């Protein structure tokens, strides 16, 4: 209902928000494997290579704009906490404006983006020119849906900030299922090859925007009516501060990209076998820790609503912190135990039974202890990312990420000459620990500042940027 304020965070309510978000995080990559299976049965190895290369470009491009989901989540949660329906909808208008603008810029710059992808992934690698042409075909079709993809990201952030992670899961699942069905139709039945695969995904992404629009209509109907509480003037007035928030989250995300790319690049110095082992273990870590996204999103929601609340802020903050920490700690411990017990079996499943699989598995097992402890190392960073996003203090996320990245570089430089690839893994583990430790150190000061300031902005900007 329109006047509803923030819900107190309990273990039950936090889990109710966290589990659909966790499932949404893992549904897309799991069902995305269907695309590879379909193309493997309906096209040749060149098409499969082109789809893999194109998918890598798309992943980096779209993931870089994930800041829009995070910023809209924190901002909408704060507006909900303050019971400001006009501001809540103004943030959606801002997000859609930014999303469509960025999406159309990507569409306009499609040719330079494709050329850059070709240069980085084909010209400097062993990939064939045929695979490069297949990648270009794939990207030209996929990028047509860029405005829909980025705008949908904004819609999903707006919904998650209100705790509507059930809708997040439903939309994400629908996109994946539509994609899988259209892939089977276009590739296996109509024999359209890589262009058909790309078209299936692009159409599914457009359908996702349509479903997101229906979700917005449903939620606004529940919160006072579809036609009420919209204000373009309010959306324009706060746009500068929203852009600053998005900038800081983008920088934070870019720094993570730099660290992960540096990890891959530094590992290449140890030879092909170590590169393969590092690739397997890193992708395993990134996949299993997706489950931690759910509690992090719950933290965004409850901390954001506590930030916007006009009464009992301190109690709401403490409850949000405490209950989401319980869930993320339990999930991290569960993932740690699963990796510790089933690591050998998991490696056999991932690597398969190819001609070099046994040596790759043996090499990966040498460094598996680092991967086993990674869920525990990253848990605090995940939860505190959600806490700081909910408090819309992305400036601290940016600064602590920069310091953590410098620590990663220093540890890698000092340890790799002494202990080789183990030093690289130690640097990554310390990077994850530093993220959490630095955010934990910054939190008391940020909490004290945010409790006394206005909705949705860092305290230094609240008084001048928010509409009165």
Task: Report each predicted region and the residues it spans.
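Short alpha-helical transmembrane segments in multi-pass integral membrane proteins
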Residues: 1-21, 76-147, 178-181, 187-247, ...
């Amino acid at each position: 209902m329109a006047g509803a304020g923030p819900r107190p965070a309990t273990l039950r309510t936090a889990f109710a928000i966290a589990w659909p978000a966790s499932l949404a995080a893992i549904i897309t990559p799991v069902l995305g494997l269907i695309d590879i299976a379909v193309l493997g049965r309906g096209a040749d190895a060149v098409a499969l290579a082109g789809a893999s290369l194109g998918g890598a470009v798309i992943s980096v491009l779209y993931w870089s704009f994930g800041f829009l989901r995070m910023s809209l989540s924190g901002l909408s949660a704060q507006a909900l906490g303050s019971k400001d329906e006009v501001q809540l909808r103004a943030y959606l208008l801002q997000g859609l404006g930014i999303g469509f603008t960025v999406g159309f810029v990507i569409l306009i710059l499609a040719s330079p983006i494709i050329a850059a992808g070709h240069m980085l992934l084909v010209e400097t690698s062993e990939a064939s020119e045929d695979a490069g042409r297949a990648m270009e075909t794939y990207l030209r079709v996929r990028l047509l849906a860029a405005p829909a993809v980025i705008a949908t990201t904004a819609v999903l952030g707006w919904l998650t900030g209100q705790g509507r992670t059930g809708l997040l899961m439903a939309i994400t699942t629908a996109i994946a299922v539509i994609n899988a069905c259209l892939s089977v139709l276009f590739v296996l039945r109509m024999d359209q090859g890589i262009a058909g695969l790309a078209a299936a995904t692009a159409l599914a992404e457009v359908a996702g925007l349509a479903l997101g629009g229906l979700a917005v209509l449903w939620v606004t109907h529940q919160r006072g009516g579809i036609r009420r509480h919209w204000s373009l003037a309010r959306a324009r007035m706060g746009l500068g501060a929203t852009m600053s928030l998005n900038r800081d989250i983008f920088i934070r995300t870019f720094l993570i990209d730099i660290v992960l790319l540096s990890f891959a690049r530094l590992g290449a110095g140890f030879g092909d076998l170590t590169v393969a082992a590092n690739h397997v273990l890193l992708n395993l870590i990134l996949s299993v820790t997706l489950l931690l996204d759910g509690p992090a999103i719950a933290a965004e929601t409850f901390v954001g609503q506590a930030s916007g609340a006009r009464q009992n802020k301190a109690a709401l903050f403490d409850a949000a912190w405490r209950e989401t920490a319980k869930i993320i700690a339990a999930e991290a411990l569960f993932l740690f135990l699963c990796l510790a017990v089933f690591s050998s079996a998991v490696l056999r499943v991932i690597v398969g039974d190819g001609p070099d699989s046994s040596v790759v598995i043996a090499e990966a097992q040498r460094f598996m202890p680092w991967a086993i402890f990674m869920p525990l190392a990253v848990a605090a960073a995940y939860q505190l990312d959600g806490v700081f996003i909910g408090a819309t203090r992305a400036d601290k996320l940016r600064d602590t990420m920069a310091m953590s990245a410098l620590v990663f570089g220093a540890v890698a430089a000092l340890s790799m000459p002494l202990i080789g690839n183990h030093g690289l893994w130690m640097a990554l583990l310390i990077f994850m620990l530093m993220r959490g430790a630095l955010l934990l150190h910054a939190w008391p000061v940020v909490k004290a500042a945010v409790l006394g300031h206005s909705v949705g902005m860092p305290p230094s900007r609240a008084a001048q940027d928010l509409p009165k």
